[in-house]
From Swiss-Prot:
Its EC number is 2.1.1.214. It is found in: Cytoplasm. SUPFAM superfamilies: S-adenosyl-L-methionine-dependent methyltransferases. This is tRNA (guanine(10)-N(2))-methyltransferase TRMT11.
Amino acid sequence: MALPCKTGAAFKKYLLLLAQENCEFRLPEIKSLLSLYGGHFNNLQDEHGKSPFCILNLPSEEMARKLMKRTVCAKSVFELWGHGKTFMEFQQSVLSYPLENMMSYLQPNSTYKIIIHSFNKTLTQKEKLEKINTMEFIPFQGKVNLQNAENIFYLLEDYGSDPNKAPNEPFEIFFGRWIADGQRELINSYSVKKRHFIGNTSMDAGLSFIMANHARVKPNDVVFDPFVGTGGLLVSSAHFGAYVCGTEIDYNTVHGLGKATRMNQKWRGPDENIRANLRQYGLEKYYLDVLVSDASKPVWRKAPLFDAIITDPPYGIRESTRKTGTQKEIIKTELFPESHVPVQLNYHLSDIFSDLFAFASEFLVTGGRLVYWLPVYRPEYTEEVLPRHPCLKLISNCEQMLSSHTSRRLITMEKVKEFEEKYQYAHLGEGQNLPYKGHNSFREKYFSGLKKRTAREERARSEMANAENVKSKGKEDV
């Protein structure tokens, strides 16, 4: 069920209790955070991928606590004292745990309590007490204190992935000392529902923090979003102490003008902007700036400026894909007005990703990460369609379902080579981004599936109505 990593002589086993949402994102987040703190996670949990239990080998409890101060995908971490697929195997595992590692938590002058956690099965209070009583083989000498215990122990049981088919006995049993909880409360405290400035496509708070963790954002980093929108991705990075900036082609969005997104509010208020969002959370000191600028035409000095690039490019579904330009050549004269507003053209998804990769290869520091969303039409998806660049290495690829036929993938890339002029056009390689060629290519596929589903539903309703008519007519004839 839980899959351990490779063992080491100086390492202890720790048990992670993972959240049961965004399952594909969990282990890549843990792996990224461990690499940030100098740890390693060598084996991924391929078997039973939805299990909330994951065994890690860590060099110290301090690293486990650091991990919990960042992760939003893990609920808790425990020092693992034993585990097994049967009670006898479990008991033997706990008894073989070094006694010297236990004794400081079993002293007569200490207090403790044991909590039962069952995955996908509800236990009665009587059943929980019976399970606690089975732990008498551990030499607890302290006093039980259910309100304010010094040491908290957990007995965790895995009853499989289907709550409707839970067996009588668990597939696996774990016992350990609770160390720390993760940062799941950030999802609620930074909820978009409570945010001052939002838009139609503001990123979910939980996914924003996952992206920041995949990017290994740390204090004093400079994080950039070339398609910043309402700045949801900047908020999570600023929470972790990074300085944030971005660009956005829509003047009204950057300056908080125009129609409001919220129900019962017609126009945006005078203080609705990205800076106000950071101010709301006490993070304004990390705000560098957001420019009205075209992501396809970088305005930056040619140098590695950013420690991470975190972005959600427009797909053409609820936000249009645009860039500045014109179909015809315009000769600028001395009389050319300074206040001229450039014409905006369609910006193909294939060009968006090509430009994004070219930008990241040049402006990311070596070792910096690019984290972005890639929309996917599932019947056509293979790993070969992923954009590539010789300066960037694929770290993780996680899927979030949007509908039966579409999804989006959170792609994490790391810059492993210094940019050279010979890489300037590497992103234009033959065959790259073919599924994204043409304006609104993903939008057309997205809505083609929607139309088919709507047509099926209409046919079903029509057939049902016809059946009812035939039935009522038969009754009249009788």
